[in-house]
Amino acid sequence: MNPIDSPAWRALAAHAEAIRPLHLRDLFATDPQRFELFSLHHDGLLLDYSKQRVSVETMALLRAYAETADVTGWRRRMLDGESINHTEGRAVRHMSLRAGDQAPAEVRAALARQQAFCESIHNGVWRGFSGERITDVVNIGIGGSDLGPRMAALALSARQQPDIAVHFIANVDSADIAPLLASLNPRTTLFIVASKTFTTLETLTNARTARDWLLATAGQESAIARHFVAISTNLELTKQFGIADDNVFEFWDWVGGRFSIWSAIGLSLALAIGWKNFEQLQAGARAMDRHFIDTPADENLPLTLALLSLWNTNFLGASTEAMLPYSQSLHLFPAYLQQLEMESNGKQIDRDGKPLNIATSPVIWGESGTNGQHSFYQLFHQGGHLIPADFVALREADFPLPGHHASLLANCLAQSAALAFGQTAEEVRAAGIPEALIPYKVFPGNQPSNTLLLPSLDPYTLGQLLALFEHKVFCLGVLWNLNAFDQWGVELGKQLAGQLTPLIEGNGDLSAFDSSTRGLITALKG
């Protein structure tokens, strides 16, 4: 059913008309206990959503809609292994990758292989063609085969393993790979080629360049076996590349790319932080899985985040959502969320193949604090756009230095308060500001936000954080009645690029293309 046909949806739309004129200043003034009422605690995490433009009635109506949309039923279908990714006929089982002792036998066996491989690198058992230890690992992948491990390796850089440096290559632009190769020693470098099908254009182009670079020094094709491993399901193509079957780590079609950090795609991360830390990452995610499955709606963190996003997007009219981590270690978390949220839910066709005719995923963007304050926060405060935000902060610093962390936290809390409450003309006037400047000093406020406090940034809490947002994305897909686990929107551009590449490299008939594309190709060829 289209969401807008639901009585629960219509009740929310009517309620929004009553809520929209209210200011967060008024909501806090009428309820001094608002923080206690609109905050959730779980396993060291604190979610403060009191600065959202909601009331008790709002949350009750949102939860009623979640019941109508059958979030609980769809969650059960996912856990039971039903093919809820119906357009591809696939189950969605990424949670089983981090299920620990309860994981399927095939998952436990795959993880044991990954652990043994990681330990062979860290212990110096695995060596390059020259007999030297591996000192550098390069992950070659793109999208879900890059964003998750890259983000997490930076987030957990305080736990970087000694004597191993892990690098990431994604873009087909030679400016990505060429400078890195120039800095590395082919005798001590290992490449991980991450591509489920082993046909991804960007990944295979970079992998071939890396292979040529290695062979220019090694001379013998046999060296590939000591310097390349693959994460793929296509043994035929990995073998053609020169990678032995024993050096291929499998994963399954029920693992979507943007949910794959828990699989062999996380191999580069495990090499960066060590296997015990990787297990703690999985443990944190597993704990969040249990919370999501077992906790009632009114205390459920992922569902609450999803409902607030739905409210802001579909009933208050927001078209974007900002992720603002006040942690430089989480600098890449907004980029990771861009794929997780927008590739999952950026769709206009429902599960029945019919147009939705409502907004779905907001545009996700952001920057680490305090950097963003000196670039785009001006727009937040006085730009006239409704921009809901998620602030993420750590109670304890990754790298404690006197004076740094208190200032960072103060800025985080100050920005969330300033966005919520603003500054009135009367307050500006009372501060003695010249009358002519008063309009420029007014801050409208009423910008909704969440603040998520983590005790620290360690593998366990990062696992919690990633699983929290994975489950938020799942809930939103159900609430919008769409399939969050396919991504047909990425296909057309790839098909056209395949047609255009030979035309740019050589000559060919351009008549099938539009005048803009023809003109640009002609200009590129000089």
UniProtKB/Swiss-Prot annotation:
Assigned GO CC terms:
cytosol
GO MF annotation: an example = monosaccharide binding
- The record's top EC class is isomerase
Q: EC?
A: 5.3.1.9
Q: Which GO terms describe its biological process?
A: gluconeogenesis; glucose 6-phosphate metabolic process; glycolytic process
Q: Which InterPro entries match?
A: G6P_Isomerase, G6P_Isomerase_C, Phosphoglucose_isomerase_CS, SIS_dom_sf, SIS_PGI_1, SIS_PGI_2
Determine if Iron-sulfur is one of this entry's keywords: no
Keywords, ordered alphabetically = Cytoplasm, Gluconeogenesis, Glycolysis, Isomerase
| Bilayer-spanning residue ranges | none
Catalyzes what?
alpha-D-glucose 6-phosphate = beta-D-fructose 6-phosphate
HAMAP family, per the entry: G6P_isomerase
Family assignment from sequence similarity: Belongs to the GPI family.
Query: What is the recorded function of this protein according to its Swiss-Prot or TrEMBL entry?
Result: Catalyzes the reversible isomerization of glucose-6-phosphate to fructose-6-phosphate.
The protein, known as: Glucose-6-phosphate isomerase
Species in which this protein is naturally found: Dechloromonas aromatica (strain RCB)
